[in-house]
């Protein structure tokens, strides 16, 4: 990072608007980039020795990932007290909130959305990166209806032939091998989480539910769930294939992409291209130096110059003309933010600290083959799910290639290595070898609070928030800015199945 980065604070480059989310590990703010007037999300993490290693690992992962369905890193700004990670702002909300408000998706829409998620996960797995916390809260939908995966706080680099031992992620999305505390293949665990996600977006609730944590874990370990009758045969087949208890029989991400139900997303893998000199010319008109911009891009500094370039490039990639990006916005005016802070638990979870707030219920080791399993009565309007020992339903599903490679037991996860020219190498001291309190599978077990049942509708807005919302609305009217139309929420029961 440029040597002058410490001399500048966030306020010199961004106008912070309000908080999107917060937690014990950091706070995510909605902000306006002063030079380009673009809205961004800034995650502010306290600069401390226990956080440095985790932040370095996560930033290195974000640097490595460039995919249209993965959150884009713009800049890393280090101040005397905080590390500020600037990413693109996705205003459409997360899939969890969307499903809770609008109900489950129609299959055609779910095919498109799930295909994009599969494409992004495949891109990560091809680089030996596993996410480890795939869930609806960590998938945002943009204004065009496309989705992006966020929150790579638990993402790790897994060498081929490595088994992981540390438990991390969200309990309701745990694979059986994690519940049983067995060494596991990170990619196969990601695949299981994709199955939970697919079930949720097409039914509106989780496949494994129980009145207690132990009951939920027992259902996960035995693969006990039911399928609503409205689910098509191909979708049912795909869910059964993914939620296969033995990990060695579980399909790979490539197998899932080839399934006839999945709508494959054609993505041109981004390649190193020459800088857009039209963007550089625009930045020079804002006071940036062309040579510094080129050097920052070449060395991947993710400093102020590179951040401004990436922010403008993101706007151009969305179809905005070079000349209209700046000319349509007065120099001293940022876009009007939403009338009230949007509910963005997924953004707030971006790199937020995991909490070890859930007890580990010890379960007997349940062999997935042949042993008697507890009987699960089907609810009215539901199909009885196949057990882990039942053969998969054949619906032109390609044979899964057997993986004969042996796995070496690994004592822990391998963190994504920092890039040689990482922006933090010259900015932050490297602490002595120690476990950092981030939940990146290096220390004790870290899990996010799981959703055992479909949560109840949000509580009523407080008087202060209502007053704040009215003030924002009045200001919007005074500025002659039309308010965004309200979307009517549909309060559906957690057990109600859409026809």
Swiss-Prot record:
Alphabetically ordered keywords of this record: ATP-binding, Kinase, Nucleotide-binding, Serine/threonine-protein kinase, Transferase
Molecular functions (GO terms): ATP binding; protein serine kinase activity; protein serine/threonine kinase activity
Stretches assigned to coiled coil: none
Catalyzed reactions per annotation: L-seryl-[protein] + ATP = O-phospho-L-seryl-[protein] + ADP + H(+); L-threonyl-[protein] + ATP = O-phospho-L-threonyl-[protein] + ADP + H(+)
UniProt xrefs under InterPro entries: Kinase-like_dom_sf, Prot_kinase_dom, Protein_kinase_ATP_BS, UBA
Pfam family, one: Pkinase
Record-stated family: Belongs to the protein kinase superfamily. CAMK Ser/Thr protein kinase family. Smok subfamily.
Record: residues binding ATP: 20-28, 43
Keyword Ubl conjugation: no
Function: May play a role in sperm motility, especially in the regulation of flagellar function.
SMART domains, sorted: S_TKc (SM00220), UBA (SM00165)
Occurrences of domain UBA (ranges): 274-314
Positions of the catalytic residues: 133
EC number of the protein: 2.7.11.1
Enzyme class: transferase
Originating species: Mus musculus
Name of this protein: Putative sperm motility kinase W
Alphabetized CDD domains for the sequence: STKc_AMPK-like (cd14003), UBA_MARK_Par1 (cd14337)
Domain Protein kinase: 14-262
